[in-house]
Amino acid sequence: MTNFTHINKQGNAKMVDVSNKEITKRVAEAHSSIIVNEKIYSQITQNTNSKGNVLNTAQIAGIMAAKNTSTIIPMCHPLPLTGIDISFKWDSNNDDSYRLNITAVVSTTGKTGVEMEALTAASVTALTIYDMTKAIDKGMIIGETYLESKSGGKSGDFHRKN
């Protein structure tokens, strides 16, 4: 049976003590996506949304989310993040819908990883796009959110195999 590090001997939640862990460079990349209709695609790419620039706002929201991960996920450590980069790439689904792929890369030099920060950034970026465009279509689909890769730390590197 696996021992869960976030559970104490009494079975209660605890935050893992990382004080004895080695300080290393840590980077995590997470992905998410949102499928939108042609009207939303045009509004985003032509920057005509009445609420403002959708992608810039979503990037800022994703960055803020990464910085605040420890305040919304109980056992995450507050970390001094050294970099957060959120990027976008459009794909056409050839059926009058468009997929916006979201990549969030988060880095730090510290004693614990930034996987949760990257996943939170990617998720909140997609949620912000939904929020800013839902007046046009509430049928948007937020796609799979997953860790693509991580490096640094005792557990070593991880790269998703497709």
Swiss-Prot record:
Enzyme class, first EC level, given as a word: lyase
Active-site annotation: D131
One Pfam family recorded for the sequence: MoaC
CDD domains: MoaC_PE (cd01420)
EC numbers: 4.6.1.17
InterPro entries: MoaC (IPR023045), MoaC_bact/euk (IPR047594), MoaC_sf (IPR036522), MoCo_biosynth_MoaA/MoaC (IPR050105), Mopterin_CF_biosynth-C_dom (IPR002820)
Keyword tags: Lyase, Molybdenum cofactor biosynthesis
Any Gene Ontology biological process: Mo-molybdopterin cofactor biosynthetic process
Pathway the protein takes part in: Cofactor biosynthesis; molybdopterin biosynthesis
Binding-site list for substrate: M75, C76, H77, M116, E117
Catalytic activities: (8S)-3',8-cyclo-7,8-dihydroguanosine 5'-triphosphate = cyclic pyranopterin phosphate + diphosphate
GO molecular function: cyclic pyranopterin monophosphate synthase activity
Subunit relationships: Homohexamer; trimer of dimers.
Job description of the protein: Catalyzes the conversion of (8S)-3',8-cyclo-7,8-dihydroguanosine 5'-triphosphate to cyclic pyranopterin monophosphate (cPMP).
Matching NCBIfam families: moaC (TIGR00581), PRK09364.1 (NF006870)
PANTHER family: MOLYBDOPTERIN COFACTOR SYNTHESIS PROTEIN A
Family of this protein: Belongs to the MoaC family.
Record protein name field: Cyclic pyranopterin monophosphate synthase
Native source organism of the sequence: Staphylococcus epidermidis (strain ATCC 35984 / DSM 28319 / BCRC 17069 / CCUG 31568 / BM 3577 / RP62A)
